[in-house]
From Swiss-Prot:
One of its GO terms (biological process) is regulation of pH. The chain crosses the membrane at residues 29-49, 81-101, 110-130, 138-158, 168-188, 191-211, 231-251, 300-320, 337-357, 377-397, 408-428. It comes from the Bacteria. The gene is nhaA1. It comes from Mycobacterium sp. (strain JLS). This is Na(+)/H(+) antiporter NhaA 1. The lineage of its organism: Bacteria, Bacillati, Actinomycetota, Actinomycetes, Mycobacteriales. Residues 409-613 form the Thioredoxin domain. Residues 1-24 are annotated as: Disordered. It is found in: Cell membrane. It is a multi-pass membrane protein. Keywords: Antiport, Cell membrane, Ion transport, Membrane, Sodium, Sodium transport, Transmembrane, Transmembrane helix, Transport. NCBIfam families: NhaA. Na(+)/H(+) antiporter that extrudes sodium in exchange for external protons. Residues 1-408 are annotated as: Na(+)/H(+) antiporter NhaA. Its main location: membrane.
Length: 613
């Protein structure tokens, strides 16, 4: 299957809208770089040049404009300035997940969302049992966050079997975790508000909300207003990194629309035939605007955050001076052990218990192929709290010595969380190895129910899960005809519905129309019409196609509109089968009950079927 076809995703498009290998390797490299700079910071802070470490990061940088003057240390410039880009990327991901990603499907998202909330509350409660009062109690926010970059990288290092579903669960959990951590910063780690700059910030946020209506130059407008918002929040004594989140959540996100993509393709053809500046500008604009600015910014800014901002942040904040005095103080510090217990025990217990409760009560269900044992391993790994944890250490604790004790706690917790997760995955994979999902057809072919072409007793069976609005399914019809011609009576072909409504908004109605035609014995005839007119799938169009293939239009209307329950259940039953098998793109083929992996051109399908004789 091509990369483009993998983008045609339904309920959970963000999981599959990117190349499945590139982001994972990028995440791993980013986590490795973050770890390297963490080690470098520790070595630097404990080397003969340790004094230069603190001297450099404490160096002050000042900017003045008339009577206004802003002065920050290099460390605060990193934490307050550069880290705004980190929170900007987090905000973009959160917005994307809520609008077109994991969190759009409330039933699928319920378990990781509730687990994430428990993973925020339980660690804080455990920390406060160690530090119920005094200045250290203010550091409870250190234990609520999971470091997404380290989480993904550590999962790749541990290499549990079949990690795809677990990875999606943990990323969904991490999104909610980030929302909670950012909310904690806004609500509990901001004080001494200045109302005038805060009012200016509110006006800037309103202006940012209107930028989407501009016909052009939206990118520069977001940048200028975002920088102004950062300054306003800084002057208002609100943590200015929240400007990154505010800008991100106001940037629109959407899935590519097929019609707009096709219009851009037409412009490319026109440019090829007649290259000129006008067509070049139109093509550039069409390509740019067919993808949401949210996705474009994630792609453009994300690598700089992963490979520049976060390593610099680690270098600035992880330099714990591990002399005998610091280690001795940390080993006897309730602050240190409160952080360790909160992150390691709190995350593990909170996430695992909440998941078990949701599954047992039926309030939510785990995705196919994901068991409580797998979640437990991921929950342990969620105890790696680094980026935001170190960030809150600097915000919540004023005493440098206590900051070092807290950083030691974060480092110890990260090592213990990784070790615990590794042990859990190794033990559970050995005791009860997970099985891959979706490799076998979940429901056998039933000639009385399924839509079939060919002899029901044929030795070869090809099942397709498809979508009438999917252009790749439309192209596959020619391949299917070639395959059927090649095998003749030896092949039974079966069509099952898998309408990907989020990517193809008319696909479900098209499937209903085909079922209405099936009631009059013309299922495949209607399918031909639907594939031939994929850009015209309004109900008025489908009634025209019904007339064109000779249906009784009154009966068709009764079947699809008046007495629609049978039609609806039929389409949903097929779609639910696809969900159980964790299918994610169309077309998906099964050859003799086994999922076909790889290209689906006629030659490839013929080879796969021949191998099954």
């Amino acid at each position: 299957m091509t990369e483009a076809s993998a983008r045609t995703i339904g309920p959970l498009p963000s999981r599959f809208s990117r190349d499945p290998k590139t982001p994972r390797s990028t995440d791993n490299a980013a986590a490795a770089l973050l770890l390297a700079f963490t080690v470098l910071a520790i070595l630097w802070a404990n080397s003969p040049w340790a004094q230069s470490y603190s001297t450099f990061w404490d160096t002050h940088v000042a900017v003045s404009f008339g009577e206004y003057r802003a002065e920050l240390s290099v460390k605060h410039l990193v934490n307050d300035g550069l880290m705004a880009f980190f929170f900007f990327i987090v905000g973009l991901e959160v917005k994307s997940e809520f609008v077109i990603g994991e969190l759009t499907d409330r039933s699928r998202a319920a378990v990781p969302v509730v687990a994430a909330i428990a993973g925020l509350i339980v660690p804080a409660v455990i920390f406060l049992t160690f530090n119920p009062s005094g200045p250290d109690a203010q550091a409870w926010g250190v234990v609520i966050s999971t470091d997404t970059a380290f989480l993904v990288g550590a999962l790749a290092v541990i290499k549990p079997k079949f990690p795809a579903r677990l990875r999606i669960f943990l990323l969904t959990l991490a999104v909610v975790d980030d929302v909670g951590a950012l909310g904690a910063i806004a609500l509990f780690y901001t004080d001494d508000l200045k109302l005038a700059p805060l009012a200016v910030a509110a006006l800037l946020i309103a202006a940012l909300a209107m930028v989407r209506r501009l016909p052009s130059l939206r990118g520069p407008a977001y940048a200028v207003l975002g920088f102004a918002l950062w300054i306003a929040l800084y002057l208002a004594h609100v943590h200015p990194t929240l400007a990154g989140v505010a800008v991100a959540v106001l940037i629109p996100v959407f899935t590519p629309e097929r019609r707009q993509v096709e219009q851009t393709v037409d412009l490319v053809r026109a440019f090829r035939q007649s290259p000129n500046p006008q067509y070049a500008r139109a093509v550039t604009r069409g390509l740019r605007e067919s993808i949401s600015i949210n996705e474009r910014l994630q792609t453009a800014v994300g690598p700089y955050v992963s490979f520049v901002v976060l390593p610099i942040f680690a270098l600035a904040n992880a330099g714990v001076h591990l002399d005998e005095q610091t280690i001795t103080a940390a080993m006897s510090s309730t602050l240190t052990w409160g952080i360790v217990a909160g992150l390691v025990v709190g995350k593990f217990v909170g996430i695992t218990a909440a998941t078990a409760l949701m599954s047992a009560t039926g309030w939510g269900q785990l995705a196919p192929g994901l068991s409580l044992r797998r979640v437990a391993g991921g929950a342990a790994l969620s105890g790696i709290g680094f980026t935001i944890s170190l960030f809150i250490v600097d915000v919540a604790i004023e005493d440098p010595a206590r900051q070092d004790e807290a950083r030691v706690g974060v480092l110890i917790a990260s090592v213990l969380a990784f070790t615990l997760s590794w042990a859990l995955f190794r033990i559970t994979d050995w005791i009860s190895p997970p099985e891959p999902v979706g490799l076998t057809l979940v429901r056998p072919v039933d000639p009385e129910r399924d839509h079939i072409r060919g002899d029901p007793d044929a030795p070869l069976v090809l099942v397709e899960y498809g979508d009438y609005e999917c252009p790749f399914c439309g192209r596959a019809t020619g391949a299917i005809d070639e395959v059927r011609t090649h095998f003749g009576d030896d092949l039974l072909y079966v069509w099952r519905h898998f309408p990907l409504e989020r990517a193809h908004p008319r696909s479900f109605d098209a499937a209903r129309a085909s079922e209405g035609a099936a009631a009059q014995g013309k299922f495949f005839e209607m399918g031909r019409e639907l594939f031939a007119h994929q850009d015209d799938l309004e109900w008025s169009d489908m009634y025209r196609y019904a007339v064109a293939i000779g249906l009784d239009i009154e009966q068709f209307d009764q079947d699809v509109r008046v007495h629609a329950s049978k039609v609806l259940h039929r389409v949903r039953d097929d779609a639910q089968d696809a969900e159980v098998m964790d299918l994610n793109s169309t077309p998906t083929f099964f050859v003799n009950g086994k999922r076909h992996k790889g290209p689906w051109d006629a030659a490839s399908l013929i080879r796969a079927l021949e191998a099954g004789r």
